[in-house]
């Protein structure tokens, strides 16, 4: 058993190359693939989009510790809605699965909770990915094997305000 575990521990991590903000080679996202590939369009009725803050999302009940996340894990009811999220940018990372993760806290800084807005690879998300990479000093192409923090430019916004 130890030898098997040791052999897997020494396996090289797969690489993903970010060719451009919208194109990745070798991305290998698998957890919650159903959620990431959902083609539901943004509602045309802006009243259907609820404004929220990171602390409000942080207070929501999650899937629970006993739920195994797989490619087929369905979306929770709260994930089946569209939200206008306003928050202060804490961190921006790219993941080895090709996703961009933006860590956000409340813009006021007064409430507990940091949430991650995940932007997957795909044509549907290209415009948002271009905007996020536009806030950074990142040059293309680049390759990662693990999560990689992206350096923000001096002109990057400190707060994202979504006014629907």
Residue ranges and their predicted role:
Residues 10-164:
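OB-fold and OB-like single-stranded nucleic-acid-recognition modules
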């Amino acid at each position: 058993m130890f030898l098997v575990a040791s052999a897997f521990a020494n396996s090289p991590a797969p690489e993903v190359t970010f060719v451009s903000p919208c194109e990745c080679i070798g991305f290998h996202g698998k957890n919650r693939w159903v959620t990431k590939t959902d083609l539901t369009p943004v509602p045309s009725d802006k009243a259907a989009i609820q404004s929220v803050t990171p602390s409000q999302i942080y207070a929501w009940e999650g899937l629970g510790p006993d739920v195994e996340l797989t490619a087929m894990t369905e979306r929770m009811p709260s994930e089946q809605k569209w939200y206008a999220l306003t928050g202060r940018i804490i961190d921006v990372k790219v993941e080895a699965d090709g996703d961009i993760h933006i860590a956000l806290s409340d813009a006021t800084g007064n409430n507990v909770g940091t949430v991650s807005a995940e932007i997957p690879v795909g044509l549907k998300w290209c415009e948002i990915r271009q905007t996020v990479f536009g806030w950074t000093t990142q040059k293309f192409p680049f390759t990662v094997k693990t999560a990689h923090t992206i350096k923000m430019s001096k002109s990057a916004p400190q707060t994202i305000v979504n006014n629907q």
